[in-house]
Amino acid sequence: MASNTSEFGAVQIAGRLAVPAERLDAPVDRVRCVLRCGKRYLLAQHNSRRRENIGKWGLPGGRLKSREEPRAALRRELIEELGLRVQSLVEIGDWWHRGENHRVFGCDVGQATQSFAPDELLAIDWFQYSEVVGLEADGHLRTGFELDAITAFRVRFPRVERATSTRRRPGAARTRAKRQRP
């Protein structure tokens, strides 16, 4: 899904306002990442000082350091929070939350990590898309843009699911049983 501009001049992603028009040139304050493993998406419960965020799920990531580029900041945050090194990051878009510009990237990972830094995060879990929809409906998402970011990533960067086939793959060994002779 491509982003477009509403009649009010604000950018829309996944049908909702992402960054108000007057903030389009705002510097990036925080970075977040949609991590996808197969059909599941990683959400984290951050170690937050804000009472309203306790127990809520959000995308991994954090604040940029002085003069740090967004991609470098996200790579650093993913190592700090999850011990995860990622190579390929695609930019999904920017979202405005609590007076800060959050740049969101997406990445497919081959294995669902279960490790995290307890000083940074309280918990992590991998959710099906329908479960993320339910978390939003129940008010259990931290910033309110998690579902929009995941939706934008799914639509703009669909993962090709492997179809099961009965045909033999090139180079694969044949497994036909030999006929027994009487």
Report residues per predicted region:
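Nudix hydrolase/Nudix homology domain
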Residues: R50, I54, P118-P182
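Unchanged
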Residues: G62-E146, K178
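Active-site beta-strand termini and strand-to-loop segments that position acidic
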Residues: L35-G38, C107-V109
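A generic fold-level signal
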Residues: A26-V28, R36, R51-E52, G99, ...
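Conserved Nudix-box catalytic region and its N-terminal flanking loop in Nudix hydrolases
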Residues: R36-E80
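Acidic, metal-coordinating catalytic segment for phosphate/diphosphate chemistry
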Residues: A2-R32
